[in-house]
Amino acid sequence: AFDNSAAGITLAGTLTLPAGEGPFPAVVLVTGSGAQNRDEELLGHKPFLVLADWLTRNGIAVLRYDDRGTAASEGDYASATLQDFASDAASALRWLAARPETAATGIIGHSEGGIIAYMLAGGGEAPDFIVSMAGPAVKGTEFMREQRRLITERMGLPESAFRQNEQMVEYMIEVTDRYPYDYVETHLDSLA
């Protein structure tokens, strides 16, 4: 377990170390969207457990952790923002980098975890390296539009259903592009 002191929570996780003498290169695995446990378990499959096992057998130390408010981690998942999840990942990275068994430390982020990896790489406490697995390679608004269109198609809804709410979503995107996050959050709270 490690602390995110800025959030006042403890996050539970598993650190796997390779056999032999360290220090070892090390990674933090950061999950995609949705409340995920440290194995990123979905429908009985545990991709982060499999990835951690492979990396560890190949000489890389791996920290994987339960998202805040999920499984054994403290916090409230439902009210957390992308910045909160980035803060959790940064705390994990600091904890891992401080361990005597580790050398260069980085992030492997899956999907939304890839976005978090980009955020940390551009921040003040940048990891030594990042890997983005299925993280977006286009601007977030473009990604959201395409994701929404694909979800509508997969649900079997007609094109008219997609277009029906398109204007509202485009307006929301325009607002978030135009105004700083704190301004939008304050004004949304005033509507509640």
Regions found by a protein language model. Give the residues of each.
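Conserved alpha/beta-hydrolase
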Residues: V50-A72
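N-terminal cap/lid segment of alpha/beta-hydrolase-fold proteins
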Residues: A1-G22
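Alpha/beta-hydrolase fold nucleophile elbow
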Residues: P100-S111
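Alpha/beta-hydrolase active-site loop
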Residues: S79-R99
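Short glycine-enriched nucleophile-adjacent loop
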Residues: G114-E125
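Accessory cap/linker subdomain of secreted extracellular hydrolases
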Residues: M133-A192
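Short, surface-exposed "cap/lid" segments of acyl-processing enzymes
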Residues: G20-W54
